[in-house]
């Protein structure tokens, strides 16, 4: 082929390059042209590489950041759906994911909640901080999508999800779906987003070989009963959308009658194989509205409670919806009440009063992998709790006693009044007497003019706090968001004043071994 035969369809050279090449090669002998040809091939880095089609997806990584278990459940459901469609999907907690490997991933779907004042969940903290850093690398080859869970009544609604979506795009990652922010009633939004994400991925993700098993022929009624029993044994686990029906064994008020808060201790009968919970977990409780109140509303507006209505994708009668599905003060869908294991929540006093012994209630397990006892039984524990935030520590000490773990334990507890609101006082006294509770620091804010809070006790015990942490103690914080922030500030002061650290590096959240710090919001 001569240069004059080059054209735009076959050559990557424009007319200017062709003209320059003609001038350079003019007058060369065949030997010289052969040498130039070899030289150009050498500096060209090898044979010509033609453009290729986009590489098929080999693996989908679903990362979740979850404080109460909702985001984890959504991520696991998404992963299960992807696997059912033949995709190679893995679901990983952000706390177990190495942020530096993000650039190596092929496709990433993020499901993350927001807690506190727009803060990431504990297990999302490291990844969130990594991508926000100015030194974070470029991610041009990474397709991603983000789903956020939050409470739209808060100012920083789904802030963590917004952060991930914005920053990944800034780093050059390819957004395959718009950011989806979901409020408390998130089921329909998460299902729609999950379907959209899987549809986008299905065209490129190669299918794994599916195991198709022929159903056995059922030759008798006995075979049928056996098959039905096996099907029940393979039923999906209990979760928010498939709650377990537990029987109430005890409903006991653990504050005095003249206390401001009516805090309840509930004991539930749960089959051993129904759910496997660990200290630090919480229960989600679907609490029904008072049927008499629903009847009063129906009578007041003159509507038949048997009238059929549509609620989401479900059709049911209006009275049933008012009792089990709707918040009667606002008529938006009810939300699960979170109950710390072994304690009542002050936000559900009326519901707690209505629960009678032997009554059944729907529950599901809200696991919290970020709020666990350390594996080593001799690890010291500093347990900071306010109000019902003390409940998980009751379970912690019970577990340590059952396991015979010798680690030292320090309880720092705050509430309104010593005589009215000292939750589980007899339990703490028993642990103290048995030698399992080495230190107890109390702060009752309404018993005198001083008005002490747990953060004040921390400052007073600053030197001892540092000694325990230097000995490898794990520090836990459980209570309202504002209390957790106040504890953070107190710890910064302790590290700044007592240890001489720079304020910017004085938070336990920036500790090299951050596993020593765990939080749980109420």
Swiss-Prot record:
Residues 241-399 form the FAD-binding FR-type domain. Residues 217-242 are annotated as: Disordered. Keywords: Amino-acid biosynthesis, Cysteine biosynthesis, Electron transport, FAD, Flavoprotein, FMN, NADP, Oxidoreductase, Transport. It catalyses: hydrogen sulfide + 3 NADP(+) + 3 H2O = sulfite + 3 NADPH + 4 H(+). InterPro entries: CysJ-like_FAD-binding (IPR003097), FAD-bd_FR_type (IPR017927), Flavdoxin-like (IPR001094), Flavodoxin/NO_synth (IPR008254), Flavoprot_Pyr_Nucl_cyt_Rdtase (IPR001709), Flavoprotein-like_sf (IPR029039), FNR_nucleotide-bd (IPR039261), NADPH_Cyt_P450_Rdtase_alpha (IPR023173). Its cofactor is FAD; FMN. Binds 1 FAD per subunit. It comes from the Bacteria. Gene3D superfamilies: 3.40.50.360, NADPH-cytochrome p450 Reductase, Chain A, domain 3 (1.20.990.10), Nucleotide-binding domain of ferredoxin-NADP reductase (FNR) module (3.40.50.80), Translation factors (2.40.30.10). GO terms for biological process: cysteine biosynthetic process. It holds the Pfam family Flavodoxin_1. One of its GO terms (molecular function) is flavin adenine dinucleotide binding. Residues 220-242 have a biased composition (Basic and acidic residues). GO terms for cellular component: cytosol. Residues 60-198 form the Flavodoxin-like domain. Its EC number is 1.8.1.2. Catalyzes the 6-electron reduction of sulfite to sulfide. This is one of several activities required for the biosynthesis of L-cysteine from sulfate. The flavo-protein component catalyzes the electron flow from NADPH -> FAD -> FMN to the hemoprotein component. Alpha(8)-beta(8). The alpha component is a flavoprotein, the beta component is a hemoprotein. This is Sulfite reductase [NADPH] flavoprotein alpha-component. It comes from Thiocapsa roseopersicina. The lineage of its organism: Bacteria, Pseudomonadati, Pseudomonadota, Gammaproteobacteria, Chromatiales.
């Amino acid at each position: 082929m001569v240069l004059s035969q080059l054209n735009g369809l076959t050559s990557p050279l424009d007319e200017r390059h062709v003209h320059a090449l003609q001038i350079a090669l003019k007058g060369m002998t065949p030997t010289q042209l052969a040498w130039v040809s070899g030289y150009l091939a050498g500096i060209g880095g090898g044979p010509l590489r033609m453009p290729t089609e986009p590489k098929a997806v080999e693996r989908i990584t679903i990362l979740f950041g979850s404080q109460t278990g909702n985001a984890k459940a959504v991520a696991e459901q998404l992963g299960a759906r992807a696997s059912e469609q033949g995709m190679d999907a893995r679901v990983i907690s952000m706390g177990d994911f190495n942020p530096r490997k993000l650039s190596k991933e092929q496709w990433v779907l993020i499901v993350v909640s927001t807690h506190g004042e727009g803060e990431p969940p504990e297990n999302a903290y490291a990844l969130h901080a990594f991508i926000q850093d100015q030194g974070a690398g470029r991610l041009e080859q990474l397709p991603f999508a983000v789903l956020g869970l939050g409470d739209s009544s808060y100012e920083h609604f789904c802030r963590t999800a917004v952060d991930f979506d914005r920053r990944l795009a800034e780093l050059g990652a390819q957004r395959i779906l718009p950011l989806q922010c979901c409020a408390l009633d998130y089921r329909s939004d998460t299902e729609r987003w999950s379907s959209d994400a899987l549809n986008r991925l299905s065209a490129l993700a190669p299918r794994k070989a599916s195991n198709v098993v022929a159903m056995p022929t059922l030759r008798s009624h006995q075979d049928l009963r056996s098959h039905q029993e096996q099907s029940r044994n393979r039923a999906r686990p209990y979760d928010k959308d498939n709650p377990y029906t537990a029987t109430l064994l005890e409903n006991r008020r653990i504050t005095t009658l003249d206390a401001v808060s009516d805090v309840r201790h509930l004991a539930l009968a749960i089959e051993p194989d129904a759910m496997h919970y660990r200290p630090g977990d919480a229960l989600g409780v679907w609490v029904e509205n008072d049927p008499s109140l629903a009847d009063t509303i129906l009578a007041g507006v003159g509507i038949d409670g048997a009238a059929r209505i549509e609620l989401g994708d479900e059709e049911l009668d209006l009275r049933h919806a008012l009792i089990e599905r709707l918040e009667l003060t606002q008529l938006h869908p009810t939300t699960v009440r979170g109950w710390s294991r072994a304690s009542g929540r002050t936000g559900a006093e009326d519901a707690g009063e209505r629960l009678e012994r032997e009554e059944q209630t729907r529950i599901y397990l809200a696991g919290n992998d970020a709020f666990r006892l350390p594996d080593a039984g001799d690890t010291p524990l500093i347990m900071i709790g306010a109000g019902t935030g003390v409940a998980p520590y009751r379970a912690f000490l019970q577990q340590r006693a059952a396991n015979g773990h010798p680690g030292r334990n320090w309880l720092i507890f705050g509430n309104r009044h010593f005589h009215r609101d000292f939750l589980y006082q007899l339990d703490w006294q028993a642990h103290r007497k048995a030698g399992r509770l080495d230190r107890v620091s109390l702060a009752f804010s309404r018993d005198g003019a001083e008005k002490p809070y747990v953060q004040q006790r921390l400052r007073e015990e600053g030197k001892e706090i540092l000694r325990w942490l230097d000995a490898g103690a794990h520090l836990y914080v459980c209570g309202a968001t504002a209390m957790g922030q106040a504890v953070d500030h107190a710890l910064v002061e302790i590290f700044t004043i007592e240890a001489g650290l720079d304020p910017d590096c004085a938070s336990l959240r920036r500790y090299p071994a951050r596993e020593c710090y765990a939080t749980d919001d109420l």
